[in-house]
Amino acid sequence: MSSASQPDLSTPTTPATSTSSSGTDPPHLNSNDKKSSSSTSLHQSAASYFTYPVTHVVSGLYRRLTDPPTTNSANSTSNNMMSRLRRQNPNPNPNPSSSSSSISSSSQHPVFTPVRTVSPFQPPPLTPLTLLANEETTPIPLAPQNQLLSRALAEEIRLLVPPRLQLVNSWRLAYSLDRDGASLSTLYENCRSVSARSPRAGYVLVVRDASPSASTIFGAYMTDPPHPDSHYFGTGECFLWRASVLRPPPASLSMADGDGGVYSEEALERAGLPPPPSADTTNVGRSTTLRGEKAQPKSLAPHTHGLAQGGATNSGTTTPDRIRFKAFPYSGVNDYMMFCETGFLSLGGGSTVLGFTSAHHRFGYLISNALGRYGEMEANISKDDMLPRGIHY
């Protein structure tokens, strides 16, 4: 019976062992194995409990020391901006909209505007002008028949030329009808030689009306030397001018005293008054009344033009006459400054159907080849300022 029982007990043991190896049922352990496994798990849990925080701290320190300090600079920049805002606005506004607007306005850098003051240094006064007869230092002789331009009138023209030329204190005679003859080609040649020596020089044209009924000298300032060309030339610095002696008022209305024939200062000033404020000054240029040089007595003064002698008249007194100077600057309507050909010289112009020698042009001043006649057209000059056309001298 015992042998029969042994095969019965051993038979179910084999499938139980095979079944546990497949993982379906837990293995059958003894007491020694259970004690060893429990002690090992306790040691592992205690080691991991202490090593994890140490590893975390060490890795954090390593990253802190090795990574670039981007976050630190950003934090410091934001802290600096906030401290700047606190200094600018020590009393914060509880309104969020106003605080946001103040932050946006303070973030923009204001533009520095310096405080400018007027300089105490002023340019010195201009040196008195000297008129020279040639390129040497010889002054123009005071003979009236050789002098069309007085120094007082030259000083008035000087105020209108470009500032760089106002500093020049001597004007030299480039061409004269008495000295060089009536030839337009000679005028061109003399101006060409002056331009070769002084490329930046300016030119003042002076023409005298010798008719008995008129006492007028007119001319122009030219930026370029006159020369024959097929088109207009010159700049906006060119201008036309005219000067005339004011007629004395009637003696019955302006005599200061009965004897001596001396006119009162008030009457002389009234004769050269500018137009009233209500007048139309659209085409009016610079208009000035200046005192001429003292006239010679009638017995000593030769028969010549009044402006050439600084406004001398036949009154026989030493009272200087009044010279009315008027300038016509560049108006900007067109660019017709100077136009010269071998047969004429013209200054200023327009584009209407009337002209002195052409049917399609108007000229401010036009001088013919023989230099014996001139004409003035209405281009940039009003009708009241026109001179008679075709006057001989």
UniProtKB/Swiss-Prot annotation:
Pfam families: TLD. Residues 1-40, 63-114, 269-319 are annotated as: Disordered. Belongs to the OXR1 family. Residues 147-393 form the TLDc domain. It comes from Emericella nidulans (strain FGSC A4 / ATCC 38163 / CBS 112.46 / NRRL 194 / M139). Transmembrane segments: none annotated. It is found in: Mitochondrion. InterPro entries: TLDc_dom (IPR006571). One of its GO terms (biological process) is response to oxidative stress. It comes from the Eukaryota. The keyword Ribosomal protein does not apply. Residues 279-290 have a biased composition (Polar residues). May be involved in protection from oxidative damage. The gene is oxr1. Keywords: Mitochondrion. The keyword Mitochondrion applies. Residues 7-30, 70-83, 96-107 have a biased composition (Low complexity). GO terms for cellular component: mitochondrion; nucleus. This is Oxidation resistance protein 1.
